[in-house]
């Protein structure tokens, strides 16, 4: 095991580059704390606004003696054609700004290079989000190994790896509705073309950016994955083999949040009083509450959100519904009051407008299920809490995560969404699951059928395995040790 003594004789210094989006930043901050707990000096490079989001959690970590520091770099917004103040993905008012955002982020190469010239001690390793391909140039210039972090599971990473090597499979499909089987996969899993996060061709600037990301992926020294061996063993083994052994599963990283305040403020300060939330949860029966959260970048149209709300109401089960605080939802809040929805569900439903203390809620004994958009952080947090999932994927890797949870792990029920909610086409796509479909899916998950009971048993089992994985001697704990030993050997051979 890498010991404190070894660190003191040859201190390791990891520089972390999180991508500026909540779903990417949250696990990277957890990774920083996990590594710092092993005596590694950590430097996090981010922008002022993003640093402010994690100020409380990181301040507590630093005050407890963890060797973590934050270096802030200004995002060159204007130079990239981005309005000032747009420092996070979830702050973009339209996805048209996404290309400008990615350009701005990757223009940080020059100021970061200057930082590295002055950094002490010299960095031993870079851990970078895959959305930041410029960090490969920094790693090459300073001869530092770069570890990639995708924020996805091994199931999805292996799927992407196979489909990139066999592009003709997706390219030869006759339509977006045609299904195909992923070859060389441990299980038989079918997708349609829009459901997989592998673009066969993207035009203009997008093509250049995605190619840069793929190239940076290929040339990275290795990969860390926020998952645990026992959750997806066949996929973890095959992906590790595809990466020539340099893939380490170190999750669930969220379990480093043991203090109540860290759980409550993970990612951002909650928009509901913690005591008020706990009081409401304490008033409900064990396992009776459905927690509903479709992520920080939910783009469902108003018509679909109404059907979701009415379906939750008709399910006659207590629920917490987290609604992202963005401009489009103003109409939804008007509907809540004008239609009488908020009044009708006030005794049974809790509406949280904005950011919720998700980890705190998921770990409460009264919560018995999680309706999720299947972002990997949420999927893993739900399973780690031992909760069965009601899956409602929107885009990106979320259909992969649904297939893993429902088909492979058998720890969830699909709401029945079969196509992505494309940005800019939400109104055209409209309602994919009506209120009857929502009510039926909730019953399948939370009801008393044999299937529902088996799904709940399976989810609970996976939750117990998650906690064992991060304990000393567990698979993820051992993999962090293995990663540090690998980087230690490299650092010593380079000097």
Curated annotation (Swiss-Prot):
Signal peptide: none annotated. GO terms for biological process: saponin metabolic process. SUPFAM superfamilies: UDP-Glycosyltransferase/glycogen phosphorylase (SSF53756). The active site is at residues 24, 129. It catalyses: oleanolate + UDP-alpha-D-glucose = oleanolate 3-O-beta-D-glucoside + UDP + H(+). Belongs to the UDP-glycosyltransferase family. This is UDP-glycosyltransferase 73C12. It comes from Barbarea vulgaris.
């Amino acid at each position: 095991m890498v010991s404190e003594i070894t660190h003191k004789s040859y201190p390791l210094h990891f520089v972390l580059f999180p991508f500026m989006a909540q779903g990417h930043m949250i696990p990277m901050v957890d990774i920083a704390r996990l590594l710092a707990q092993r005596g590694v000096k950590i430097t996090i490079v981010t922008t002022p606004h993003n640093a402010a989001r994690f100020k409380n959690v990181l301040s507590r970590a630093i005050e407890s003696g963890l060797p973590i520091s934050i270096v802030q770099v200004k995002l060159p917004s204007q130079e990239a054609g981005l309005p000032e103040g747009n420092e996070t993905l979830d702050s973009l008012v339209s996805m048209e700004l996404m290309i400008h955002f990615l350009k701005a982020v990757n223009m940080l190469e020059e100021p970061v290079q200057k930082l590295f010239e002055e950094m002490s001690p010299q960095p031993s390793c870079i851990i970078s989000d895959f959305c930041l391909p410029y960090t490969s140039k920094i790693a090459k210039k300073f001869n530092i190994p770069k570890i990639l972090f995708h924020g996805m599971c091994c199931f999805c990473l292996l799927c992407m790896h196979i489909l990139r090597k066999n592009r003709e499979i997706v390219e030869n499909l006759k339509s977006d509705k045609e299904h195909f089987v992923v070859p060389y996969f441990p299980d038989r899993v079918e997708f349609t073309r829009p459901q997989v996060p592998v673009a066969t061709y993207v035009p203009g600037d997008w093509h250049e950016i995605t190619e840069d990301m793929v190239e940076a992926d290929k040339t990275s020294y290795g990969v860390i994955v926020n998952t645990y061996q026992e959750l997806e063993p066949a996929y973890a083994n095959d992906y590790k083999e595809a990466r020539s052994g340099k893939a380490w599963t170190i999750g669930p990283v969220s379990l480093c949040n043991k203090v109540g305040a860290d759980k409550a403020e993970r990612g951002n300060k909650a928009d509901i009083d913690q005591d008020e939330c706990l009081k409401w949860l304490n008033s409900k029966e064990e396992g009776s509450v459905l927690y509903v959260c479709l992520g920080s970048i939910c783009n469902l149209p108003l018509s679909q959100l109404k059907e979701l709300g009415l379906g939750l109401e008709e399910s006659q089960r207590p629920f917490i519904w987290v609604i992202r605080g963005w401009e489009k939802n103003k109409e939804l809040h008007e509907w809540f009051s004008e239609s009488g929805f908020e009044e009708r569900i006030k005794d049974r439903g809790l509406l949280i407008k904005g950011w919720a203390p998700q980890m705190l809620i998921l770990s409460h004994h009264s919560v018995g299920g999680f309706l999720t958009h299947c972002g990997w952080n949420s999927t893993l947090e739900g399973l780690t809490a031992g909760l069965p999932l009601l899956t409602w994927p929107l885009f990106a890797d979320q259909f992969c995560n649904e297939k893993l949870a429902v088909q492979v792990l058998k720890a969830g029920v699909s709401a029945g969404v079969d196509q992505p909610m494309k940005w800019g086409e939400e109104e055209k796509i409209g309602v994919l699951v009506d209120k009857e479909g929502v009510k039926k899916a909730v019953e399948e998950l939370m009801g008393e059928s044999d299937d529902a009971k088996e799904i709940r048993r399976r989810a609970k089992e996976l939750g117990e395995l998650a906690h064992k994985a991060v304990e000393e001697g567990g698979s993820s704990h051992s993999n962090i040790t293995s990663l540090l030993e690998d980087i230690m050997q490299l650092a010593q051979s380079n000097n």
